[in-house]
Design a protein with these regions (language model features):
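A structural signal for multi-pass alpha-helical bundles of membrane permease subunits
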Residues: 1-275
């Protein structure tokens, strides 16, 4: 039963991707005369290929930023203190907010007429245009919002790894005269590196779900600068009624996510063997 509930919609998506289904002509739902036409069309569609490239850029930017910010915050909070325990809890707030709420918060931050960020910049003599309306900054603006929402995930994983490091190597390094940078690079980083890799892979998979941010902040614009693959599939289905083609795009995304999941599984298995 559970397998049917899980796999049923995915199988139906795959079946639909093999048809030229369009709401303009619903009878094509059972037309399997050319089952690969949508996939052939996707691989020569410049807009689809651009959406894949945009997704790659956004995923890399968000994963790198989330790892850096999460690591930095975890290092700052890696002390036993009641005050810091309260601070850690506060840092989790963005991660537990509904994605649409996060998107609305950042919409307010980026719209120049109401944005406290833009008003502060204008007050100190640094007025800037809307970050989400500028083709050069729109993708970075989305990456910043996604980082704010999800860096607590990396922070939690790294913090847990840091607190499992035994005291002996740290004390030995301090006795040998290691500075903070040397202590981090030669002692802490080797311990937490596997955690960073796993956290990065999990966030890489999850980065394909930035749809609410893009829908609320930019609608894929300016132009197609922030049009990632899942948003392009949405446009093909809801705006143009090309459900077969949209399903093919979604199926390709599922295949990519499954591949990344397999990589995570292999890394986890290799780590257990090493242990």
């Amino acid at each position: 039963m559970l397998a049917a509930i899980t796999l049923g919609p995915t199988l139906y998506l795959l079946v639909t991707s093999l048809t030229p289904l369009s709401l303009v002509n619903p009878r094509t739902a059972y037309d399997f005369s050319d089952p690969t036409q949508n996939y052939r069309a996707a691989f020569v569609d410049p807009r689809f290929l651009n959406s894949v490239w945009v997704q790659v850029k956004l995923s890399i930017a968000t994963v790198v930023l989330q790892l850096l910010v999460g690591l930095g915050v975890a290092l700052l909070l890696n002390m036993r203190s009641r005050f810091l325990e309260a601070v850690r809890t506060a840092f989790l707030i963005p991660m537990v907010l509904p994605p649409i709420v996060v998107a609305i918060i950042w919409k307010i931050m980026y719209v120049t007429d109401v944005s406290p960020l833009h008003r502060a910049l204008a007050f100190i003599g640094l007025p800037v245009s809307s970050l989400i309306s500028n083709a050069d900054t729109a993708l970075w603006a989305i990456a910043a919002a996604d980082t704010w929402e999800w860096f607590p995930f990396t922070m939690l994983m790294v913090l847990a790894a840091l607190q499992m490091i035994p005291d002996e190597p740290i004390e030995a390094a301090k006795i040998d005269g290691a500075g903070r940078l040397q202590l981090f690079w030669y002692v802490l980083l080797p311990y937490i590196q596997p955690t960073l890799v796993v956290a990065g892979l999990f966030r890489l998979i999850d980065s394909v779900k930035a749809f609410p941010l893009i829908y609320v902040l930019t609608n894929g614009g300016p132009g197609t600068v922030t049009e990632v693959t899942n948003y392009y599939a949405f446009v093909q289905a809801l705006n143009f009624s090309f459900w077969g083609y949209s399903s093919a795009i979604a199926t390709l995304m599922v295949a990519g996510v499954l591949l990344l999941s397999w990589i995570i599984g292999r890394l986890g298995a290799d780590r257990r063997l090493d242990d």
